[in-house]
Structures are given as C-alpha cells and as structure tokens.
Design a protein with these regions (language model features):
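Metabolite-binding pocket within alpha/beta catalytic cores that recognizes anionic/polar moieties
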Residues: 1-146
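Glycine-rich beta-alpha junction loops
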Residues: 30, 104, 165-170, 195, ...
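Generic non-transmembrane alpha-helical segments
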Residues: 43, 147-155, 199, 246-253
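Short, basic, glycine/proline-bearing loop/turn elements
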Residues: 67-75, 179-184, 232
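Active-site rim beta-loop-alpha module in soluble metabolic enzymes
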Residues: 137-184
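A C-terminal functional module that forms or caps the active site or interfaces directly
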Residues: 177, 184-216
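His/Asp/Glu-rich mid-to-C-terminal helical/loop segments that flank catalytic regions of hydrolases
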Residues: 219-253
C-alpha cells in the first residue's frame, strides 16, 4: 500500500506543489527533533515552518534558502524516522538528500567538532534492509561527498572520509561493543546515516552526510550523559552552522 504511493501522494503529505520542492533536503539526526530543526532553520534565510496540522501526513519541516539554494530541513532521531523523511522527500521528487548530525568517535585521536563525510555506513540501523538487498552498500554519492569535502576545506575544516557504523540502539553501546567496532576499523557511530543513504540510493537520489564528532567513545570524553557547556557549546554551535552552509553550497555545484 504505502510502497506504491506516487509523487502526487508524497507532495500531498508535504502540502507542497512540485514547483515548491527544495533543491536539497537536510535531515538532522538529533534527540530533540523539533527544537533541533528550529535551531538549524535559523541558519537559513527566510525559513518558514510547515506546521504538522496543515500537512496530511503530519510531517514537520522548515523551508528557507542559503546562497540562493532552496533548502528543507527536518529533524529525525534514528533510522526509522530518517527513512520516513528521506522516502517522503525523495518520493515527492527531491534529488539531493544530506544527513547532518553527530557521531561518536570509535578511533583515537579525534577532537570535538571534527567532521566525517563517510564513504558509506554499516547497515545495522534496522531499516536499510527494507530498501537494499543484502551486501549492497549504503554509500554516499562520490561526487557529492567530494564536493562537500572540498567546500569544508575551503572553510578551513578538515574532514575524514572513513566509513561509519549506524546503530539502532545508542544506549546499548557497551565498552565491549565499542571495542569491537573500533577493531573493525569503523571511524565512528551514528543512528541515521545508513538508513538515509539506503532510502536515497533505492529511490535514485544523490546522498551524502557530514557529521560532527560529539563524544569520544574510546577515551570517554565529552559523554552525552554530561552534555556540552561553556566554550565547547559555543564552539559546536558555530561549527554546525559552518558545516551546514558548506554542504548546501556543495550540493548546489
């Protein structure tokens, strides 16, 4: 039933006409999906909120612009929510989806705010198997990922392009599990990227991700149980804005 929905159905769920579609959709992986999306929307020009009660599917999002590019942003937490938004936007006709958010470091030597633009994400998210056959990578579009890396470099932000691991269960990450992921070479862990990549790939859309390092799971520094305060918080707010602007500019190339 829902798999057979067409573009007109997805547009109706978004309460948009085809001519109103954004050039790029940003999916923000974050705990507080509403306030998080609101915060990032403030980095856009003229961002307008689509109230869920005006949309048949109840899908909240903001639409604004940056440097002449029309951008939509939705907050999502975990693979199922990311997949729902990615499927709806891509199904409506959007051609570019970029995952933003944070990752936990699985390798030593990273710093708060370091950025990873992953080549692919390990499919342990719980959703991607519904979109891609076993053995098919949930990977970024190489040209888009490379453009993001270049744009970030122009802003003085260095990046890693190593693969990450997408998990469905953040609080189940024991020290033993973390050590195993690290031994297998994963650069970091998040919850949404594999799902977003899988959906976008299956629906023929360009996709990439740019994630900021929040907690170091090796040294156990900057634990999410403690939160960020003071200068660290101020730094991360500026970094997230710069990364968001860079990925939009890269998508427009």
């Amino acid at each position: 039933m829902y798999k057979e929905l067409g573009a007109a159905d997805h547009l109706r769920m978004l309460a948009l006409e085809e001519s109103e579609l954004p050039d790029v959709v940003l999916l923000l992986g974050i705990f507080d999906v509403h306030r998080g999306a609101e915060r990032f929307a403030a980095y856009l020009e003229g961002a307008q909120f689509s109230r869920s009660e005006t949309s048949a599917g109840g899908l909240p999002y903001y639409i604004g612009t940056h440097a002449g590019t029309r951008v939509a942003i939705s907050g999502c937490f975990g693979g199922p929510m990311a997949a729902l938004f990615a499927h709806t936007w891509c199904g409506a006709g959007v051609k570019t989806v970029i995952q933003l958010g944070w990752y936990g470091a699985l390798q030593p030597g990273t710093n708060l705010g370091d950025v990873v633009v992953p080549r692919h994400a390990e499919r342990q998210d719980g959703v991607s198997d519904w979109y891609l056959a076993k053995g098919i990578l949930a990977d970024a579009t190489p040209e888009l990922a490379a453009a993001i890396v270049r744009r970030l470099g122009e802003r003085g932000i260095s990046t890693s392009e190593q693969a990450i691991y997408s998990t469905p269960a953040l609080l189940a990450e024991s020290r033993e599990v973390i050590a195993d992921w690290s031994r297998h070479g994963w650069h970091g862990v998040d919850m949404e990227t594999a799902a977003t990549f899988a959906v976008a790939k299956s629906l023929g859309a360009r996709r990439a991700a740019a994630l900021l390092r929040i907690d170091d799971l090796i040294s156990e520094e900057h634990s999410i149980a403690e939160g960020l305060v003071g200068d660290n918080r101020t730094f991360m707010r500026g970094r997230e804005r710069d990364v968001m602007h860079a990925v939009i500019e890269a998508a427009a190339l």
